[in-house]
Regions:
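Bacterial Sec-dependent N-terminal signal peptides
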Residues: 1-23
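N-terminal leader/targeting and pre-domain segments
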Residues: 20-40
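Thiol-based oxidoreductase modules, predominantly thioredoxin-like and allied folds used
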Residues: 22-28, 48-50, 62-89, 98, ...
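Short active-site neighborhood of thiol/selenol oxidoreductases, capturing the structured segment around
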Residues: 40-53
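Detector for the c-type heme attachment site
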Residues: 57-61
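Non-catalytic, surface beta->alpha helical segment in thiol-disulfide oxidoreductase systems
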Residues: 99-143
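Oxidative protein folding and maturation machinery
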Residues: 148-198
Length: 198
C-alpha cells in the first residue's frame, strides 16, 4: 500500500512539472489580468476561442503545453483564455473586433491593442509557434515605424523584405507609396531594384 502511495505521488508530481512547462493560463477576469500585466510590466495575451472551434482545442492540447511556448509566454505575458461567445468574452470580442477563431490578442496594460494573430497562426507541433509570434511582433514594430514616417533606405529594405514574407497586400501598398517618388534612375539602382524584383 505504501509503495502504491509513493508511485501515485511521483506520478502526480511528474504530471504537475510537465503541466508547468507549458503556457500558464491564469483564471483572471480581463480587468484583473490588465492590472496584473501593469504591475508586472508584461503585456496581456488572450487566447480567444469558442467551444466549437477545433483549431482552438488543438492549440490548447498540443501547442500551448510545449516547453518553448511556456518559456516564452510565461516570461513576457499574463495569459488568459476567454470564450468569445459567453461571459466577458462577448465584450472582448466586440471591443477588439474578434470574428475568426482562434484569435490571439496581445494587449498593452492600458487595454490598447498591441497586435493580433488569427487562425493562420495555428501550428503543428513541429512548427515553431513562438517564432511565428515573434515574426508578427517584429512586423507590428516595423509597421509602426513606417507609419511614423521612416523612409530610410536600410529600414525600407528590412520592411519590404519582411512584408514579402508576412503581408503581400500591404507590400503592394508600400511599394506603391515608396517606389514612384524615387524616379526611374534611382529605382534601377541595384539596392532598390532588389527590393521590387521578387
Amino acid at each position: 500500500m505504501k509503495f502504491i502511495s509513493i508511485i501515485s505521488l511521483l506520478l502526480f508530481l511528474a504530471g504537475n512539472s510537465i503541466a508547468q512547462e507549458g503556457t500558464n493560463f491564469e483564471n483572471l477576469t480581463f480587468q484583473e489580468a490588465l492590472a496584473k500585466a501593469k504591475t508586472t510590466g508584461k503585456k496581456l495575451f488572450i487566447d480567444c476561442y469558442t467551444k466549437t472551434c477545433g483549431p482552438c482545442k488543438y492549440m490548447v492540447k498540443f501547442i500551448f503545453p510545449l516547453k518553448e511556448c511556456g518559456e516564452y509566454f510565461n516570461k513576457n505575458y499574463i495569459c488568459i483564455m476567454k470564450d468569445m461567445q459567453e461571459g466577458e468574452g462577448i465584450a472582448i470580442a466586440q471591443k477588439y473586433n474578434v470574428q475568426i477563431y482562434p484569435t490571439y490578442l496581445f494587449i498593452n496594460h492600458d487595454g490598447s491593442l498591441y497586435f493580433n494573430m488569427y487562425v493562420v497562426a495555428v501550428s503543428k507541433p513541429e512548427d515553431d509557434f513562438v517564432q511565428k509570434v515573434k515574426n508578427v511582433i517584429e512586423q507590428a514594430e516595423l509597421d509602426k515605424e513606417y507609419t511614423a514616417g521612416n523612409r530610410d533606405q536600410a529600414f525600407l529594405k528590412k520592411y519590404i523584405t519582411s512584408l514579402q514574407k508576412q503581408n503581400k497586400r500591404k507590400l503592394q501598398i508600400v511599394l506603391g507609396e515608396t517606389m514612384p517618388p524615387m524616379g526611374v534612375k534611382k529605382l534601377c539602382e541595384p539596392e532598390n531594384w532588389s527590393l521590387i524584383k521578387t
